[in-house]
Design a protein with these regions (language model features):
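Short, hydrophobic/aromatic-rich segments at coil-to-beta transitions
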Residues: 254-262
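Well-ordered beta-strand positions enriched in small/hydrophobic/aromatic, beta-favoring residues
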Residues: 173, 245, 261, 281-283, ...
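Short helix-loop-beta-strand segments that form the rim/entrance of peptidase-like active sites
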Residues: 3
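Short, surface-exposed loop or secondary-structure junction motifs
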Residues: 6-253
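Short, surface-exposed beta-strand/loop micro-motifs that present aromatic residues
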Residues: 260, 267-276
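Generic C-terminus detector
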Residues: 287-309
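Residue-level recognition of short loop/turn positions
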Residues: 150, 276-277
Length: 309
């Protein structure tokens, strides 16, 4: 795989729907051909044009009009979506990483689960990270909770499909804080884990480089309130994207260095990796919708305390 080779050379079905240009009077989608092919770099930087329906009213409308299943179903048809814009022309957080998972499977000849275990989880000692729950993991599984209109939390049923048609590169792993911190420390240490080197230092440097150029990460506006609130990690601040991390272009109010790496998971799980300060932090909860005000406040307070003089 190379970053700028057309992805269709590996997964021919990618981008087949073209770009969503609007809807006709009957509410059916109007599609056009994209101006250029999607590359791996587009997918990793969320500039491919793909979007999640929870942050795109147009994709949510398309999915409803066409009967396309949700990504969370684990069905291959869920990835058969149009683009919001021509590749490379804007930023939208979406299913591009799921397509990267498909590319990895195509070139490795392994399932995504087997490949990640071999090259990442096993070398890092991430013994509790997997797509499918073992019985001993299920016994320790933290339940998901929903935040109601009154602010109270209540248990809700939530589980990713255990035998899906595809494992999502963009989500679906179970794990622990200890496991994920092993990954974060490896990135913080320039690709090394103890005496083992998993990634070249120059690879990590490229991963940590802002790839967006004149583009920028924009606030994510919710179109599915049950899944996510509006999300803006650094209000009023410019942000970029690496391979594949959120990058704050200026120092944050929490003391995070400019150029640090971060991202999150749907259940209000958050992390940062700050090469400037030499720190990394993990915050895990199991709450929906995403970007819960109390959870993000606790995460910010946690980072502020870590960075305090």
């Amino acid at each position: 795989l190379t970053l700028d080779t057309p992805a269709a050379a590996v997964v021919p079905e990618i981008g087949a729907k073209g770009v969503l240009a609007g809807f006709d009077e009957a509410g059916q989608p109007i599609l056009r051909q994209a101006k250029r092919p999607i590359t791996l770099r587009h997918l990793l930087t969320h500039t491919s044009g793909y979007a999640y329906d929870m942050w795109s009213a147009d994709i949510a409308r398309y999915r409803k009009a066409t009967g396309t299943p949700a990504v969370g179903t684990g069905r291959n048809a869920a990835l058969d979506l149009p683009l919001l814009f021509d590749p490379g022309e804007d930023w939208s957080y979406g299913i591009g990483i799921d397509w990267v998972g498909k590319m990895i499977e195509a070139v490795s000849g392994e399932t995504l689960s087997a490949h990640l275990s071999r090259v990442l989880f096993d070398p890092l000692g991430m013994v509790d990270t997997s797509f499918k729950l073992r019985p001993d993991q299920r016994a320790r599984l933290a339940g998901m909770h929903g935040r109601g209109p009154d602010g109270a939390l209540a248990p809700i049923a939530f589980e990713t499909p255990q035998d899906p048609e595809f494992h999502g590169g963009g989500g679906g792993l179970y794990g622990t804080a200890r496991d994920y911190l092993a990954f974060a420390r490896m990135i913080l240490n320039g690709g090394k884990h103890g005496g083992l080197r998993l990634l070249k230092a120059e690879t990590v440097a490229e991963m940590a480089r802002d790839q967006l150029g004149p583009l920028a990460v924009r606030p994510m506006r919710s179109s599915v309130p049950s899944a996510t609130n509006d999300a803006d990690f650094f209000p009023g601040m410019p942000n970029g994207w690496g391979l594949t991390f959120l990058i704050n272009r200026k120092p944050s109010p929490q003391g995070r260095s400019a150029g640090a790496l971060a991202w999150a998971g749907l259940g209000n799980t958050f992390y940062w990796i700050d090469h400037g300060r030499g720190t990394a932090g993990i915050f895990l909860s199991q709450i929906l919708p995403f970007f819960d005000a109390k959870a993000i406040s606790l995460f910010r307070d946690f980072e502020t305390m870590v960075n305090a003089p």
